[in-house]
């Protein structure tokens, strides 16, 4: 989904894509412009969404070299796509679709104000089959969509995709502030590391980060484990002798 500037949390699945390419996978990135439109991203402006798609293409090319791209606009124009959306919908229920709205970062009631939002989970499940992938990759917040795709597979007599979920980086603001799920989000600027932040700004944000003694729920250690170690392989910390 095109949604503005890239933050550190987005680098986690990008690094996983890079690993998969190195392992011999053919990785296709779905640049989900129509999904962004449904989810009111970038003001719902198609000029903004198209610019966001091009920005994402550039960012993935930098951090995940070797991946291929497909836009949702290209996918929805392919023969059989909307038939698959209807088949997925037919094999599910309104209750299930409502529960899956969380993949958009939305409350279950949001679909009552905008009917198109109920198409979103069915589209995301249909995307997996339209792209004919063996493995669907996404953050943990996308598990409802992947489970929907797997659950309808038996009814539609389709091969179940493998679902691979990457962890979400916690907000530097800590739990309970700004973001209800406590994940890194652009809605909390001080709790989010943008890839375009200067070293000075990154240092300032990290120096004020929520960093409890406990390992669980520590966003600084999350960055270490899920971002720095996979990206750098080894890290040396030099401390003055005391």
Map each language-model feature to its residues.
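N-terminal catalytic cores of NTP/NDP-binding nucleotidyl/phosphoryl-transfer enzymes
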Residues: 1-39, 135-149
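Conserved nucleotide- and phosphate/pyrophosphate-binding catalytic cores
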Residues: 125, 143-242
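Divalent metal-coordination and catalytic microenvironments
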Residues: 7, 60, 181
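Short connector loops at secondary-structure junctions
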Residues: 32-44, 166-172
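Short, compositionally biased low-complexity segments
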Residues: 28-31, 60, 238-242
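Generic structural "secondary-structure junction" signal
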Residues: 8, 39-41, 105, 117-120, ...
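Short low-complexity, flexible loop/linker segments enriched in glycine and/or proline
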Residues: 43-46, 178
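Divalent-metal (Mg2+/Mn2+/Ca2+)-assisted nucleotide/phosphate chemistry catalytic cores
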Residues: 46-165
């Amino acid at each position: 989904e095109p949604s503005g500037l890239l933050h550190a949390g987005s680098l986690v699945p990008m690094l996983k894509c890079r690993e998969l390419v190195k392992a011999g996978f053919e990785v296709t990135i779905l640049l989900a412009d129509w999904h962004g439109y449904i989810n009111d991203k970038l003001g719902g402006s198609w000029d903004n969404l198209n610019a966001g798609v091009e920005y994402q293409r550039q960012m993935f090319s930098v951090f995940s070299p070797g991946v291929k791209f497909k836009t949702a606009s290209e996918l929805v124009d392919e023969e059989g796509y909307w038939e698959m959306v209807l088949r997925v919908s037919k094999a599910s229920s309104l209750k299930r679709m409502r529960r899956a709205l969380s993949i958009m970062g939305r409350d279950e009631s949001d679909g009552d104000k905008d009917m198109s939002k109920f198409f979103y989970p069915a589209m995301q499940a249909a995307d997996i089959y339209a792209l004919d992938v063996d493995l669907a990759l996404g953050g943990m917040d996308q598990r409802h969509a992947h489970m929907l795709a797997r659950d309808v597979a038996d009814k539609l007599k389709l091969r179940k995709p493998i679902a691979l979920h990457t962890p979400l980086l916690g907000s530097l603001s800590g739990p309970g502030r700004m973001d209800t799920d406590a994940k890194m989000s652009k809605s909390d600027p001080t709790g989010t590391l943008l890839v375009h932040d200067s070293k000075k700004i990154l240092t300032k944000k990290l120096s004020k980060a929520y960093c409890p003694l406990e390992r669980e729920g520590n966003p600084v250690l999350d960055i270490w484990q899920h971002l720095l170690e996979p990206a750098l392989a080894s890290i040396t910390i030099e401390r003055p002798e005391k």
